A protein has these predicted regions:
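Predominantly soluble domains enriched in secretory-pathway, periplasmic, or organellar proteins
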Residues: 16-195
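Bacterial Sec-dependent N-terminal signal peptides
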Residues: 1-23
């Protein structure tokens, strides 16, 4: 019995791999902390290698998501109804950044496609189009329901509608043509689709 135990232990130990990933000490890691609803205490923590090099407190009320594009960080702040844009430098984020008011839209998720930012919005039930040169919201694409996740396949945008306007569970995915910013089709899928 003792030999079986030792043999099992030996087989187990040689079967383990060292999968510890090395940390690139020149790369920045940005962690968004949502904060408490209604408290405006969402925050960002920036690490370089293993060292925390910057903390940005009180970013807003519910940091929903972050997206990087070129040397910019886009922070979607849901309950503050804004998008914050920071320039990314080797030493962290350049402050104070730019605030883009979304007019009480309750923004959720953001992607960049062809130098324009597309972001989903619960309150306005749409996908807004943000020009990245002027930071002007140039268009709103209406959808039927509360849009959440948004992805691009390189040609089209796909938006998950996971809740209806009455907050009941929805089951559709919307396909958008970013060339003309129009909804092409709506597909019925399972309840509560996500990315």
């Amino acid at each position: 019995m003792k030999r079986i135990y030792l043999l099992s232990l030996f087989i187990f130990s040689i079967g383990c791999e060292d999968n510890i990933e090395k940390i690139d000490t020149n790369e920045l890691l940005i962690i968004a902390s949502e904060g408490n609803f209604g408290s405006s205490n969402g925050s960002l923590s920036i690490f370089k290698g293993k060292e925390k090099i910057q903390t940005i407190d009180d970013v807003g009320d519910v940091v929903q998501s972050i997206t990087t594009y070129n040397n910019k960080l886009f922070v979607v702040v849901n309950n503050s109804h804004l998008i914050k844009v920071f320039t990314i430098t080797e030493s962290g984020l350049k402050l104070p950044g730019i605030d883009i008011n979304t007019n009480n839209s309750s923004p959720r998720e953001l992607i960049v496609h062809n130098n324009k930012a597309y972001f989903t919005n619960y309150n306005s039930q749409d996908v807004k189009v943000l020009d990245l040169e002027t930071y002007y919201i140039e268009k709103s694409i209406k959808v039927n329901g509360l849009p959440e996740s948004i992805v691009s396949d390189g040609k089209h945008l796909w938006v998950a509608i996971n809740m209806n306007p009455d907050y009941s569970s929805a089951n559709s995915v919307v396909k958008i043509d970013p060339e003309n910013n129009q909804v092409i089709n709506t597909y019925e899928v399972g309840k509560g689709p996500q990315q």
